[in-house]
Amino acid sequence: MGDIYNAIAPSLTLGCGSYGGNSVSGNVQAVNLINIKRIARRNNNMQWFKIPAKTYFEPNAIKYLRDMYGIEKAVIVCDKVMEQLGIVDKIIDQLRARSNRVTFRIIDYVEPEPSVETVERGAAMMREEFEPDTIIAVGGGSPMDASKIMWLLYEHPEISFSDVREKFFDIRKRAFKIPPLGKKAKLVCIPTSSGTGSEVTPFAVITDHKTGYKYPITDYALTPSVAIVDPVLARTQPRKLASDAGFDALTHAFEAYVSVYANDFTDGMALHAAKLVWDNLAESVNGEPGEEKTRAQEKMHNAATMAGMAFGSAFLGMCHGMAHTIGALCHVAHGRTNSTLLPYVIRYNGSVPEEPTSWPKYNKYIAPERYQEIAKNLGVNPGKTPEEGVENLAKAVEDYRDNKLGMNKSFKECGVDEDYYWSIIDQIGMRAYEDQCAPANPRIPQIEDMKDIAIAAYYGVSQEEGHKLRIERQGEAATEEASERA
């Protein structure tokens, strides 16, 4: 197998190469007709670690906008809440404190799940009315994601959204390659919630509300030019948003650490980000106003960005693939969806499958060991075996979610209608399987398994119970169909 698993390109044949010992192109020559068994030596492909050129952090880091080179015409991308909270005014104050005069426009109509129409509308304004040299995205993941695609469509109007949403397995070898950005404008991302990590990643999630699809768009050209991680701006997060965003960051760290793209450069970021979230999320949400809570909020803000740096190069997995799908179809907050699914995915990936995914640099399935390492890093009992460590970690995540944060245990508790949920189970399985995050999962996610997990997560029961419920439902449907035919 070639691509990320081996530097040898596949021959796509089972001819004499297979007879010689394997099916790669380096084993299909005349010499291989002799009955000598040869096996290609495994060579790992080059990997990468890519982040914005500049990342500024610590309280009041937005002051960098006063000195940043080349800001004369700026567009501020946000939502209405950022204006109401006065955060946009703080950005404007920094621009007005510059030595040169800055003209600016505000795009304040980004919705919680930014749509294709919204990004196209914003890009059209930039092209036709203003032509900014700087795009400043301020807010949660939605304004930052929207600004990335606006940036792309502003600089390259010839590109259509249908092109950039094309799937790929290896980001370096995709059918459609996004051209470089930054010739017309720089993108500055300023997060005000501590979760998405979008300020340092090459990802943007855009929703097609006509079809209900959430598209995770991925290309390193979309990596912001500058990230400003100012914890002061995150102090206004409502309690529920802080919980959801924090669990999103925790899921980023977990999935980056067990991803098939995980590497020495991302592992440190992922583990430390997970530890920071574990130690500080509850205090940042529940703590009384004061020095301890302020410190916890600062650590959470840093953790979210560090987790973003990890998954920006290691990618995510099936938890996010399912969360994108269920969130779009059921209108459940992304972080809340992740918090509901994460324990199920830990147990699913933590059990050794009959046919495990091949891992780069590894010759056996090691997800259980990786979860055990996460547990040990968090101070959770790692158990005597990897299997014990997996179960202890899943239970600890459930306990943290349920008891320390008081979050919903199931999608039913989130208010999702039961009949509607059953009507979309097939869509959930198929769309999650097709999601761009799924290929990096350590265990190849099967559609039927994801249906079972989705059903289990609706009722808050085990995956095994979810499987039984699905089989019973299928039997009832078959009986009803037979009766109608009779």
Residue ranges: model-predicted function:
Residues 420-486:
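Short, amphipathic C-terminal "tail helix"
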Residues 1-46:
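C-terminal segments
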